[in-house]
């Protein structure tokens, strides 16, 4: 009943994009033809998903970016997460501090014990029961409703749960997981500058289920149990944005009473999900999965070889960007990925603790 009430009284959705604008040589140029609109969007998003290549670790003379792309150098990756990796003196200072912090976290968590991932039929059923059936479709046309129907069959549920378990253990994802559909939304109504649009990625439903199982549940639980999440993140269960705001006000009041100099900076992490570096992120995941490389490689392969098609007011595009043949493989987590919010918390926890310990 509440669903029907909310659906009736809530604000209408932003319409699908039919035109975009770009600033070319200081002038605003508008595109209204389908091919031009799709090309402008794809060129912008291709740049967004390659921003993480500017991270110093990718340009290191040590070749860490290439060696750890799919955690190919297993020995080096495990040395970093166990704190036994010798960090060269010529490595960029911020990168060196982050690697040391990952090693400190690894010494606390990684124990060489059982790190198997098993997707049980009960967990699979519980996940799909909670989801909204009316979530937008991915490219394959398989959506949440298909899986919500499938969980009513006992054998089908067992097979689908076992499929995710096999994928996590083998590190080999289905080809369909590397095809995505992208929708652009206006952040500000009427403003259609392509760099001001929010990109939402629609992934395969079972890929998002996999991400939820690995990153949102198991990895996040490990991070919480280790008490590693700094209180600044306010990600504890029961905490709200209001709690964080009141805490900031209290902190400023205490600083004023103690006459202690203090600065509060509001910094927007622009394109934060789109520019997450996979080398650093994969090392954090590796720690929190107790060294389970295949489960992480599955996600990395899909995200780095993802081929994105575009959905606009004209329909779905025939052209795409990304894929295996791109000069700079794509990084980032993608909005619409169920692993993105918890992964951002996990990465932020490492960054905040790096600052605290230095």
Residue ranges and their predicted role:
Residues 1-117, 126:
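Non-catalytic, polymerase-adjacent accessory regions of viral genome-replication enzymes
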Residues 355-358:
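Short, intrinsically disordered, charge-balanced linker/junction segments flanking boundaries
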């Amino acid at each position: 009943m509440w669903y029907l009430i909310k659906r009736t009284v809530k604000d209408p959705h932003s319409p699908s994009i039919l035109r975009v604008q770009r600033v070319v040589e200081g002038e605003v140029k508008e595109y209204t033809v389908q091919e031009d609109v799709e090309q402008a969007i794809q060129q912008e998003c291709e740049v967004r998903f390659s921003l993480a290549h500017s991270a110093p670790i990718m340009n290191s003379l040590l070749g860490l970016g290439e060696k750890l792309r799919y955690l190919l150098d297993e020995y080096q990756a495990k040395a970093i997460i166990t704190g036994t990796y010798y960090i060269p003196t010529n490595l960029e200072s911020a990168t060196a501090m982050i690697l040391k912090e990952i090693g400190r976290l690894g010494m606390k968590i990684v124990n060489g014990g059982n790190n198997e991932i098993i997707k049980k039929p009960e967990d699979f059923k519980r996940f799909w029961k909670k989801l909204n059936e009316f979530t937008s479709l991915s490219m394959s046309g398989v959506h949440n409703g298909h899986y919500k129907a499938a969980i009513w069959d006992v054998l089908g549920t067992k097979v689908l749960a076992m499929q995710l378990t096999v994928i996590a253990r083998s590190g080999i994802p289905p080809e369909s997981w590397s095809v995505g559909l992208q929708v652009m939304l206006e952040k500000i109504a009427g403003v259609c500058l392509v760099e001001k649009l929010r990109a939402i990625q629609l992934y395969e439903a079972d890929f998002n289920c996999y991400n939820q199982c690995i990153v949102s549940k198991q990895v996040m639980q490990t991070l919480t149990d280790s008490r590693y999440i700094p209180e600044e993140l306010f990600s504890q269960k029961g905490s709200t944005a209001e709690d964080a705001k009141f805490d900031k006000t209290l902190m400023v009041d205490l600083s004023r009473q103690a006459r202690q100099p203090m600065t509060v900076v509001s910094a927007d992490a622009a394109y934060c999900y789109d520019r997450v570096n996979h080398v650093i992120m994969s090392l954090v995941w590796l720690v929190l999965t107790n060294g389970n490389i295949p489960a992480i490689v599955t996600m990395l392969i899909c995200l780095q070889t993802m081929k994105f098609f575009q959905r606009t007011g004209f329909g779905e595009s025939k052209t795409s960007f990304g894929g295996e043949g791109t000069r700079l493989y794509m990084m980032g987590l993608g909005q619409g990925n169920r692993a993105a919010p918890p992964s951002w918390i996990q990465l932020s926890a490492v960054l905040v603790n790096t600052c605290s310990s230095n």
